[in-house]
């Protein structure tokens, strides 16, 4: 057997249906689109239209709103900060803030600030300057001998 003699097994492939190639073919003229009407024309796909049935996006209720004052924080776990320190990407002696985490590759881009969460463990004595931190994260950092600087809340 040679490469040029290779063939697909019998019944493995199915010939594609060539529509609109004469009425003798059985699928000529209208090409399986029926007769006239919007959907028989080319380029038609009415998004969200379900043939007169009430469309899904109108059957479901409106819900919620977008808070224009909402803040979107980068959430970083203590375990990821410790991993960056262990890999010598972060300096534990220096103050760790959003810019330092960005340069170390811990976060991809800085949003409205960084919020530290307590996932994982931290052993390094670090000083964090962040927009927010969970209570358990602050406890873990202070237990390791570090400190967290949070912004003052406006009264």
From Swiss-Prot:
Biased composition annotated in UniProt, kind: Gly residues: 21-35
Region (Disordered), start-end ranges: 1-41
Basic and acidic residues biased stretches: 1-13
GO (cellular component) term, any one: cytosolic large ribosomal subunit
Annotated Pfam families: Ribosomal_L27A
Single Gene Ontology BP annotation: translation
InterPro entries on file: Ribosomal_uL15 (IPR030878), Ribosomal_uL15/eL18 (IPR021131), Ribosomal_uL15/eL18_sf (IPR036227), Ribosomal_uL15_bac-type (IPR005749), Ribosomal_uL15_CS (IPR001196)
Family matches, as SUPFAM superfamilies: Ribosomal proteins L15p and L18e
Chain segments annotated as transmembrane: none
Keywords: Ribonucleoprotein, Ribosomal protein, RNA-binding, rRNA-binding
GO MF annotation terms: rRNA binding; structural constituent of ribosome
Domain of life assignment: Bacteria
Function: Binds to the 23S rRNA.
HAMAP family named in the record: Ribosomal_uL15
PANTHER family xrefs: 50S RIBOSOMAL PROTEIN L15, LARGE RIBOSOMAL SUBUNIT PROTEIN UL15M
Family membership: Belongs to the universal ribosomal protein uL15 family.
Subunit details: Part of the 50S ribosomal subunit.
Protein name: Large ribosomal subunit protein uL15
UniProt organism field: Chelativorans sp. (strain BNC1)
Gene: rplO
């Amino acid at each position: 057997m040679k490469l040029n003699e290779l063939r697909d097994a019998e019944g493995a492939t199915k010939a594609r249906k060539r529509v609109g190639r004469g009425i003798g073919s059985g699928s000529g003229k209208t090409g399986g689109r029926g007769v006239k009407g919007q959907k028989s024309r080319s380029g038609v796909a009415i998004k969200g239209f379900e043939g007169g049935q009430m469309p899904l996006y109108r059957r479901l209720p409106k819900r919620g709103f977008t808070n224009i004052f909402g803040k979107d924080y980068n959430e970083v776990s203590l375990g990821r900060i410790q991993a960056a320190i262990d890999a010598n990407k972060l300096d534990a002696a220096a103050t760790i803030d959003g810019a330092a985490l960005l340069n170390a590759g811990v976060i991809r881009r800085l949003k409205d600030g960084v919020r530290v969460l307590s996932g994982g463990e931290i052993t390094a004595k670090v000083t964090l300057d962040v927009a927010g931190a969970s209570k358990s994260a602050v406890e873990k950092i202070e237990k390791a001998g570090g400190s967290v600087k949070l912004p003052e809340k406006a009264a």
